[in-house]
C-alpha cells in the first residue's frame, strides 16, 4: 500500500516496479497518470476507485490514462477491505450511497498485490518548517509575497512548496517568477 506519489518516485526515479496487479483509490490527476505509467511498465491496473460521483482529475487524463488502456473507473465506490498476509492479496470495493457509506451487497473483489492511494496532496513543507518560514493554514504551504519570497528574507518558494498544483504549466510560470526574484535579490547584495 503506497501513495501514488511514492509509487511515482519508485517507478520514475528509482526504477523499481511496485506491483503487478494494482487498484488505485482516488481519481486525481496523479492517480490517473500512475494508472497509465503502471500499465506502460507492465502492471495490470484493475480499477481506479473514486468515492465521489465524479473524477477529481482532468478529462484529458481520464481519456488518456484510463479509457485508452481500458482501465475501469468506479465512481461512487470505495475500498472497504484489504486482505493479505505480508502483502496485499485482495481488495474489496463497494458502491457508496449519497451518505458516502458502503452499500451492502455491492462488493467487488479484486485479486491484486498493490494499492495506490491518490486521495489528496499536501505541499512539501519539511524544509519550510525547518527554516521557520510562515505557513498558510489553508494550503499547508509557505506564505509568499508576490515575488515568491517567503517570510524569511532571501528565501524564495514556488511549486508544491507553496501549494499543490494541478498542472505543471502553473509551476513553470511560478518557478520563473521565483528564480528571477531570487537572482535579483542575490545581485542586489541585500542582507539581513
Model-derived regions, located:
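Residues forming the flavin
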Residues: 1-192
